[in-house]
Structure formats: C-alpha cells, structure tokens
C-alpha cells in the first residue's frame, strides 16, 4: 500500500525534491510498523532499499566477535536510511532494529530507490547525506586519534550502561 506524499514532507531528504520525485517515492513506499527490538525485513535478509523513519528510531546493528550487538548507525524521526547503499558499488547491507516501543517506517525496495535516484535532485541529496555521514565518522576518528584512550573509555561506558541500553 502506497503512502501519502505529505508523509514525506518533513523529511529533509525530500525538502528540495521536485513534486514528481516525491510522488514517485510515495507511490513506491509502503508503511511498516515495528515493535521494540523487531527487525526490519524478513529477518533472513538484511534490508536493502531506501526508508524514512516516520515515528520512533531505528538502529543498524551488527554482532561483535564476542557475540554482543553493536549499534553502527541510528536513524531518528524524519531521517532517511539506506541511501549509502544506493550509491555504493559494493553495498554493505545492514540489519535495522527498532529501538523505540513503536516505530513506523516508510520503505521502498532497491529497484524503486535506484529509479528515484534518476532524479538529479534526489541523487544529489543522497550524496549530501552520504558526505555528512562520512564527515561524522571522520570526526569520530579524529577524536579517537587525538585522545587514544577515548576508545577504551567509550567501550567502558557502553559496557557499564548495558543494562539501560536502548537495545535491551
């Protein structure tokens, strides 16, 4: 079932999009409601497409070598997720988990998302989001380089707050 184009209006990714692109996206997206800790998709294959958080929060998670979950990315209200894979030659598919009691997302499959990227404004928007992600990661790397102990401190903080973690 398609969503209404006005549901995408608050999303920054669609702010400067031409009406035809917004209509296309809305007509190819469907709404999914997730409970806390529920995985987006069928659970067998990681999500591969483009999505927008309409309510709640999602986290991309992976397992560490010792079997713990580690949050890689967080998508909050009105944020787009999955955009990096649309531009990558070798995408990294991520497992997205709802971290709010009630999370709603609008998603489209990879093929429709690739077609959406044929609109120049949408491809530029995805590139800008990706550039911001890279800058955020570089900033984090810079903090770790300047303060080598920070990686251990952050690991300790995560470990110490595990009982109160949003992933539990």
Predicted segments, located by residue:
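His/acidic/aromatic-lined binding-pocket segments of jelly-roll/cupin-type domains
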Residues: 31-32, 41-42, 48-54, 71-73, ...
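Cytochrome P450 core scaffold surrounding the K-helix E-X-X-R motif
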Residues: 61-67
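Short, solvent-exposed loop/turn elements at beta->coil junctions and helix N-caps
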Residues: 37-42, 145
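Cyclic-nucleotide recognition modules
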Residues: 71-135
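Short loop/turn motifs at secondary-structure junctions and domain boundaries
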Residues: 23-24, 40-44
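Polybasic "coupling" helices that flank or enter modular domains
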Residues: 121-168
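Glycine- and acidic-residue-biased ligand/ion/polar-headgroup-sensing regions
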Residues: 37, 48-61, 77-78
């Amino acid at each position: 079932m398609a969503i209404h184009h006005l549901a995408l209006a608050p999303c920054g990714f669609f702010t400067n999009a031409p009406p035809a692109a917004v209509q296309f996206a809305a007509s190819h997206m469907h709404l999914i409601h997730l409970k806390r800790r529920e995985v987006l998709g069928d659970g067998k294959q990681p999500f591969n497409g483009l999505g927008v958080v309409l309510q709640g929060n999602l986290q991309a998670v992976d397992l560490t070598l010792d079997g713990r979950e580690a949050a890689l990315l967080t998508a909050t209200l009105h944020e787009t997720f999955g955009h990096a894979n649309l531009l990558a030659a070798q995408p990294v598919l991520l497992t997205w988990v709802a971290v709010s009691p009630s999370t709603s997302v609008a998603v489209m499959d990879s093929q429709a998302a690739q077609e959406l990227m044929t609109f120049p404004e949408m491809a530029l928007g995805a590139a800008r989001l990706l550039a911001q992600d890279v800058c955020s990661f570089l900033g984090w790397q810079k903090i770790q380089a300047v303060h080598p102990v920070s990686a251990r401190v952050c690991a300790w903080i995560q470990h110490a707050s595990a009982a109160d973690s949003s992933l539990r």
